[in-house]
């Protein structure tokens, strides 16, 4: 996935992307979860560059695609955007939280406030390395919590993650947001596996 800082993607690359045209994935505690792309080929490679090699220019591209997808698919007003956080250890290793960067790009594109509403309170195994849905759910159960003092009462909150597979991480975080008062949680990812 060749991304140019000043132009984004060339038109030829845009045509070859694995566009995800379904209406959205059903995820527990979310109204829907939207993703503009399928997680394969050039998208998978681009996400790996973004997450593991510091290709932060991808955040702008992916964030723009996510914002357009949310605008086109959801169509209702949202009150704020938040993200699935990484642990402090992972933040220290990478130097950035990829989902926070994505959330900030989506917020900038849509003119919506971005808030840090969640924290990851324990390390988990990488979800991508776990194959069964039940094991994925067990891996993230209790790993997230709403930040102390956060009040989302009556709000429609967009929850940003990079990729949705089984929906276990998204559901766990969405449940925390609902406990913090969110009326609706709308999932938004770059890609769906």
Describe each region flagged by the PLM:
Residues 1-193:
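Glycine-rich phosphate/pyrophosphate-handling loop used in enzymes and phosphotransfer proteins
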